Regions:
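Active-site-adjacent C-terminal substructures of enzyme catalytic domains
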Residues: 9, 19-135, 159, 174
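Metal-dependent enolase-superfamily TIM-barrel catalytic cores that perform enediolate-based chemistry
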Residues: 1-20
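C-terminal cap of metal-dependent C-N hydrolases
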Residues: 120, 141-185
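Active-site flanking residues adjacent to catalytic metal/cofactor-binding acidic residues
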Residues: 12, 84-86, 142, 147
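Short, electropositive alpha-helical surface patch
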Residues: 2-4, 70, 145
C-alpha cells in the first residue's frame, strides 16, 4: 500500500500453477504486470484488460514444469497487453533464451511470429513501464540486434542457431561477429 501511495505500481507473481485468484488481485490494485498468468479465466482476462495490467507469459517455465501452455489467442481477444519473458531461475526455468521462448510461444501458445516478437520487445517494455525501450522510434534508446538471417522470422523458427550479426546499445555498435556462422550462405 505504501508503494502505491508513492506512485509505484506493484507487480505480481500470479496464477502459475493454478487459478488462485491472483489475477483479480492484480487487476484490483492496477498492477503494472502480473507474471506467469498461466491459468486465467475469462473474468481474469477482462479484469486485466480493464485495469491495464500487462500479463507476462513465460513459455520456458511451462516447458520446464510441464504445465499446460496458455492459449494466447484468448488473451489477445480479451484485449490484454501481453509480454513474453524467460524467467530464467534455478528452480523452474532453466533457459534464458528468448528465441527459445519465442519458438514455444508460436508453436504451442498460438502466437503469430509478429505477436510473439512484439510481446518480447514492446510488450516487455510496457510491463516495465518503459517508453524508451522495446521499439525503434524517435526518442527511443535504439537497443537492437541485426540478424544474420534472410528474415526476422528465422529468430523464431531457428531458435538454436546463432543468428546475431551485430548488437547496438543506445545506437552504438557494441558487438559484432565479423565472420558470423551462417547456415544461409
Amino acid at each position: 500500500q505504501a508503494g502505491i501511495e508513492h506512485g509505484l505500481r506493484p507487480r505480481l507473481h500470479a496464477n502459475q500453477l493454478t487459478d488462485g485468484g491472483a489475477l483479480q488481485l492484480a487487476a484490483k490494485f492496477k498492477c503494472a504486470s502480473a507474471d506467469h498468468a498461466t491459468f486465467a479465466s475469462e473474468a481474469d482476462l477482462a479484469a486485466a484488460a480493464e485495469s491495464g495490467t500487462v500479463l507476462t507469459l513465460l513459455p520456458s517455465i511451462e516447458f520446464s514444469t510441464r504445465q499446460p501452455y496458455p492459449d494466447a489467442r484468448r488473451y489477445f481477444e480479451a484485449g490484454v497487453t501481453v509480454a513474453i519473458a524467460s524467467d530464467c531461475n534455478p528452480g523452474s526455468g532453466f533457459s534464458n533464451s528468448i528465441p527459445f521462448c519465442l519458438a514455444i510461444a508460436v508453436r504451442d501458445m498460438h502466437f503469430t511470429v509478429d505477436q510473439a516478437l512484439w510481446a518480447a520487445t514492446e510488450g516487455g517494455a510496457k510491463a516495465l513501464e518503459r517508453e524508451d525501450v522495446g521499439h525503434l522510434r524517435p526518442g527511443a534508446r535504439a537497443d537492437f540486434s541485426i540478424l544474420d538471417a534472410p528474415s526476422y522470422r528465422y529468430l523464431v523458427y531457428r531458435p538454436g542457431v546463432q543468428q546475431i550479426g551485430a548488437v547496438f546499445c543506445e545506437g552504438e555498435l557494441i558487438a559484432s561477429n565479423p565472420q558470423p556462422y551462417s547456415v544461409f550462405a
